[in-house]
Amino acid sequence: MPAIFVDTGAFYALADIGDRNHSVAKSVFEVRGMAGDLVTSDYVFVETWCLIRARLGRGAAIQYWDAMQSDVVTTHGVTTKDLSQARAIASSWPDQDFSLIDCTSFALMERLRLDEALAFDNHFRIYRYGLRRERAFRIVH
């Protein structure tokens, strides 16, 4: 099975049982996480830690950090080439408010040839890539 990129919103939903997307995130993690199909970036890891710490407290953030040390999710580092590509993405989509994390995620997904994302961020539905922007990520829920 192809790998799935996991975005911040999915990690947060998994950590917060009160989140409206908790059950969806939990289901995907249970099925695909055991198969070793989940991938994220170091930028998403840090953004998620900060979000969980701000909303759920330091204890929950440490719990998330510990869980990320397992083999359930593979974390890839954003490279300088990814950063250059991310900047090009931000420039070529002036009508969209893609965050730095979104742009680096898109660049990393393209580099790793990942077509699927577990994301609740609408930007993953909007972004198109390929020679004529004919390709879209498939959102897994």
Language-model features: locations:
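Short, well-structured N-terminal submotif of metal-dependent ribonuclease cores
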Residues: M1-T40, R53-D66, L131-R133
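Active-site neighborhoods of divalent-metal-dependent phosphate/nucleic-acid chemistry enzymes
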Residues: T75-A117, N122
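General small-molecule cofactor/ligand-binding pocket signal
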Residues: V39, H76, R138-V140
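Short active-site oxyanion
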Residues: M34-L38, V72-T74, R113-D115
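A generic structural signal for short hydrophobic patches within well-formed alpha-helices
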Residues: F11, F45, F124-R125
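Acidic, PIN/NYN-like endoribonuclease modules and their adjacent C-terminal/linker elements
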Residues: M1-A3, F106, E110-H141
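Short amphipathic alpha-helical interaction patches enriched in hydrophobic/aromatic residues
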Residues: Y12-A15, I52, V72-V73, A90-P94
